[in-house]
């Protein structure tokens, strides 16, 4: 399993690096990041799209046509639209979530920022996001860009991943720890 994960990570890093270089040459890093975010939102909102990118059952041609149609309908054109088509043609759609995360990380490093992935049980308000950014800036010593995802299964609290560090204050983890402690006592 770890071998597969590192393979996907390697593929994602190479594709993200190539896309970043192209975006930098075209002076369009911000717009590429925005388009990737729009595609990521489509991906998180559609089980069928997630199945399309992860299933080997679909042919390269089917994936290429579907991704092209989805990108066109979503208004994702230019560099990102072409990039998605190349990824589909090369049968690397399974790596798209990793590619998007790697691109964000590379872009943040280029801006002198650090990127943090935040999982919350509920949608964070802009005031909460700003407070979290300020707190993380104090910890990291750099400006922090946060990518927030909502996962109700954590019940409450936050899970923050910043570089190689993870801070898990989720209620689910606290309940699991309490359950283990009670098993040891009883």
Swiss-Prot record:
Coiled-coil ranges from the UniProt annotation: none
Keyword terms, alphabetized: ATP synthesis, Cell inner membrane, Cell membrane, CF(1), Hydrogen ion transport, Ion transport, Membrane, Transport
Gene3D superfamilies xrefs: N-terminal domain of the delta subunit of the F1F0-ATP synthase (1.10.520.20)
Membrane topology: Peripheral membrane protein
Pfam families named among the record's database cross-references: OSCP
Gene Ontology CC: one annotated term: proton-transporting ATP synthase complex
Subcellular location: Cell inner membrane
InterPro entries cross-referenced by the UniProt entry: ATP_synth_OSCP/delta_N_sf, ATPase_OSCP/d_CS, ATPase_OSCP/dsu
GO terms assigned for molecular function: proton-transporting ATP synthase activity, rotational mechanism
Oligomer status and interactors: F-type ATPases have 2 components, F(1) - the catalytic core - and F(0) - the membrane proton channel. F(1) has five subunits: alpha(3), beta(3), gamma(1), delta(1), epsilon(1). F(0) has three main subunits: a(1), b(2) and c(10-14). The alpha and beta chains form an alternating ring which encloses part of the gamma chain. F(1) is attached to F(0) by a central stalk formed by the gamma and epsilon chains, while a peripheral stalk is formed by the delta and b chains.
UniProt function note: F(1)F(0) ATP synthase produces ATP from ADP in the presence of a proton or sodium gradient. F-type ATPases consist of two structural domains, F(1) containing the extramembraneous catalytic core and F(0) containing the membrane proton channel, linked together by a central stalk and a peripheral stalk. During catalysis, ATP synthesis in the catalytic domain of F(1) is coupled via a rotary mechanism of the central stalk subunits to proton translocation. This protein is part of the stalk that links CF(0) to CF(1). It either transmits conformational changes from CF(0) to CF(1) or is implicated in proton conduction.
NCBIfam families on file: ATP_synt_delta (TIGR01145), PRK05758.2-2 (NF004402), PRK05758.3-2 (NF004406)
Sequence similarity: Belongs to the ATPase delta chain family.
Protein name: ATP synthase subunit delta
Organism: Brucella canis (strain ATCC 23365 / NCTC 10854 / RM-666)
Gene (name only): atpH
